[in-house]
Amino acid sequence: MRILVVSNLYPPVAFGGYEVECSGVVERLRERNDVLVLTSDEHGRSTPAQPGVRRELVRLSHDARGARRAPLASLRAVASARRALAWGAELIYVWNGSSIPQAALRVLADSDVPLAFRICEHWFGGIFLNDQFMRELLPASRPPARAAWAAGCRALNSLPSLRLDPGAPMRTAISWNSAAIRSMVRVQPFIEPVLERVGHSVPRYGDLYAAVVREPAPEPEIVFLGRVTLYKGLWVAIEALALLRSEYGIQARLVVVGPEDADHGADMRDLAERLGVGEAISWRGQATPEQAAAALARAHALIVSSEWDEPFPLVTIEGALARVPLVASDVGGIGEGMHDEEHALLFPRGDTGAAAAALVRVLREEQQTTARVERAFERAQAFRLGPYLDEQERFVVDALAALTSEPLTSA
């Protein structure tokens, strides 16, 4: 089978674990199929050319600059999509359509090629309608300047090479990465899912984390493993650390492992200094999986303090495989993967006091913590790479079968 995979990013260019997950699925599919990847040109000139990967789509920022670039980027994206269709795909599998011109996805959806989606994030709820170009094609009350811009977008869309309809009907198959994201995303009425499945995401390097030999640091060490950006809630971990030291007399340290959004990283350092814990925090920056595993080997706890509704964060599974006690926000799909009290201690979103109290329990209730860690390790076995890749392979085959069957019609 010839499969066209579309994603906003593709390794070695990656923002998080989902892009790495995508590349694992592509590698598996290539064992029995021809696969072409269409992705963004992010870091395109510095990224080595890869067989079967086209880095052609413009990656758009979610701001005024991105909106200004969107019309011409959409024109280019449509041309890229049509070139990809000329390759002769028998199935299109869209992995992540966020931050790329969704005009490309609209062209693919309007073709006769069966179309499936892997949904790991919230973007699918606003597909086409929130796109920075196609949203201007919809009727709406706009201020004068915005109305003029929308008129220009509609004029561009009148070109024979475009003529896109954001709300045109679309039959598809959907693989959701958690029941949580399935419940959080509203599927637009013009979309007809003919097949839906929940297939939980899994860590690409699960075996590496499962092989971690625990050597906890002499003093309590808490690890935050993730991007230093607003929605990941590092401030919760920093304030919880301050409470551990000031209210509970626990001289813990916080190890921050992950790439930083520069401005937010500076804000977090300022917060740590104001709270008097600046010297108790180590900033490790971007890490390889091996370096992350080494940090987990020393950790007394892993804190996942996200403020947004994480669909299914892989870091919780990685920590469980490494046998590190988990303290996490009760948001999105976190509790779907690791159940409260049974596998982890969950706290309400943004509640620094509850986060600190959960960390105290982990550090002081040795027997309960040990038992919880063992249960979490067993739970994490449900999220291993081999069975997941088998499941994705079955989904692709079943999606093609469902989408090529005749649609039901009313009598």
Sequence positions of predicted segments:
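Nucleotide-activated donor-binding/catalytic signature segment of Leloir-type glycosyltransferases, i.e.
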Residues: A266-A287
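N-terminal subdomain of nucleotide-sugar transferases
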Residues: M1-R45, W87, S111-V113
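A structural motif in glycosyltransferase catalytic domains
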Residues: C22, L29, I222, A237-L241, ...
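Glycosyltransferase donor-sugar binding loop
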Residues: L225, R253-D267
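Conserved acidic donor-binding segment of nucleotide-sugar-dependent glycosyltransferases
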Residues: D340-E341, L345-T352, R361-Q367
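N-terminal strand-loop element at the rim of the active site
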Residues: Y10, R32-L72, P259
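A conserved mid-protein helix/loop that constitutes part of the nucleotide-sugar donor-binding site
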Residues: V20, P220, T229-R245, A266, ...
